[in-house]
Amino acid sequence: MDIDPKDITISKEFQSIVVPKQLTGPVKAILQEKKLSATETKNVVDDPNGKRIILIPEVTELPKEVLEKVPEAKLEPYPVTLTYKQLTYIELLRHYIPEPLVIPTSFETIGHIAHLNLPDELLPYKKVIGECIILKNPCIKTVAIKQGPINNVYRNMELEVIAGKNDFITEVKQSGFTFKMDFSKVYWNSRLQYEHDSVVATFKENSLVCDAMCGIGPFAVRAAKKGCRVRANDLNPDSYYWLKENCKINGVSENVECFNMDAREFIRKQFDNGGCDYIVMNLPGTAVEFLDAIGEGAKKNRETARMPIVIFHSFDNKDGDYVASLRARAEKALGMKLPEMDIHNVRDVSPGKFMFRCTFSCADLFADEDDDKPHKVE
């Protein structure tokens, strides 16, 4: 691990042909069109007999168009010494990481931060992996890995910087919005951009949206920009801070009331204060457990509060009967039967584990009861 990736050089054998100087341009154009010209290195060099055009190593025969112009042309091996600038990310890392270990090729980008999860067998190579990510991705200034699972109440990760500067204050631009955060102190997942857009697309303009576990505001800011009135809450004081900042940055502060309290208390207050049109709970690990507050609030305030549409996210095993599993868990927490619940598969989290979006209407909870005491509808 003592070798700086910038010091690495590799000798690689390419194919080449020699052509008369005056035919260099036309022949090179043919080869480029057919994607046969080398791209890792300078593809035209001087030669005593004219110009040598460097081709990719995989070429086994020349196109007939080239032979028509230069009948005497023939393929010749041509060794080239490649530096780190010309080597690919995988070629650089393979200098350090032996077969059959798999080189990590994907990571989440959060502004200038690259975040990735490394299996145990790659941890000895974490520093050089980080350095190579920065070398081959100029926009990345910080590379971090997660240390253990997310198991604290605030959902933020314990991060280790493996390369670059220790700077977690960053900005992300999504769907025309800007979200600023301290990535080390809040929860953020760039892969949920489409889900944020999809959920907010279901909201009606001028509706009242209550986001009980809002994080730094990906749902709240979008909903407010759409014209909804939003009450956004998160228990994490750092998320609360960045929520307010992001409302200012995106010009929606007037449409968003921000809260920093327990989600159950927040939900109960919404029912006690007349209800709302939507309740969102984007905490897949435990959101289903908070349905008890919705069940209590709906029963207690059935006559006086609007009955919202509830949208919550949850993990489950897709290989089993996830519909029955999600429904059973939801009904247990609610303390009520669910006549209907829409379930949408959001994304694959890990082998066999999926994130689902579950949607139901609180009004449907009372569908089988008599209507002598209808709940308030506005």
Swiss-Prot record:
S-adenosyl-L-methionine binds at H196, D234, L235, D262, A263, N282. InterPro entries: MeTrfase_TRM5/TYW2, SAM-dependent_MTases_sf, TRM5-TYW2-like_MTfase, TRM5/TYW2-like_N, tRNA_Gua_MeTrfase_euk. It is found in: Mitochondrion matrix; Nucleus; Cytoplasm. Its EC number is 2.1.1.228. GO terms for molecular function: tRNA (guanine(37)-N1)-methyltransferase activity; tRNA methyltransferase activity. Monomer. This is tRNA (guanine(37)-N(1))-methyltransferase. Specifically methylates the N1 position of guanosine-37 in various cytoplasmic and mitochondrial tRNAs. Methylation is not dependent on the nature of the nucleoside 5' of the target nucleoside. This is the first step in the biosynthesis of wybutosine (yW), a modified base adjacent to the anticodon of tRNAs and required for accurate decoding. The keyword Membrane does not apply. Pfam families: TRM5-TYW2_MTfase (PF02475), TYW2_N_2 (PF25133). Belongs to the class I-like SAM-binding methyltransferase superfamily. TRM5/TYW2 family. It comes from the Eukaryota.
